[in-house]
């Protein structure tokens, strides 16, 4: 019996999305693009090799997430990062975009270096996770087949297909208020308001879509046009949104890992996500205020708030970047403690996919992409720790 056909059949039966078009392009070709080198195109749990199936599923999902993060950070690096190519981690840098870099430097003079380093880190994460999976003869994750979204046309950006869309974002900034709360915790059912309300409505671009949106302006106190500065401010808060997600996700999925070495991997990589988030949390608070900025595409007129006016309000004050002690596990039983939040493990992977989707990162993506990503997330959420 042909074992590969048997495994494909089992996965088609297990996942309804496999019945609705993914196989139409040919299992061998498309499957290789989806899962990389492994036992077969659509290996089910049997593709865990020498790993516990749950551990393999967690690592495979995180490898996919890191590819998504690497893709978006690559776009930021091309336009706004330090322009030193460091193959294989960072390539394709052609000089950046002077106006966008200037606008980012208004948040912090070291922003280009931080962007460069964050990009390098995410590349290393996805490379390591797939390499580890392969070393255990487990299926890997490879999303290259879905690099079909358009690039920015501004100077500095490569004209290549992308996994993510940074030009139609609706950014959740509730992480700002969540980490300042002394009484509330999302794991206990609490909700939080967006700190920068304008970013949580409509669609915003975090990179210049073209050179008209990336302009130096010596007459402006920021040295760039208000449109360019607004885009950089948006990026500053998006950086933190992405990395606070990773901060929680690794802690959430670590609770499902079985093998000590897999747990070590999750804790070790997760710690770097925390460092990223702390950095971007600090820099976002330096965003210059702006009034009456007109989006060249949507025509919307928007303001960016003066964050310095948050001073004295402990729910919003910019320099309160250390996690405030808050309720944990049980509000009545235990005192407040400074923690990462959320860390509830139930449906953590599916929650991460939803957050990315709500953010607008995948606007324009193929339906097969969503089916695959949700399938990987479901597998990760089904993992159970074994002792």
Where are these regions (language model features)?
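Non-catalytic, regulatory and substrate/membrane-recognition segments associated with hydrolase enzymes
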Residues: 29
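All-alpha RGS (Regulator of G-protein Signaling) helical domain and cognate RGS-like helical scaffolds
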Residues: 2-8, 19-26, 35, 40-387
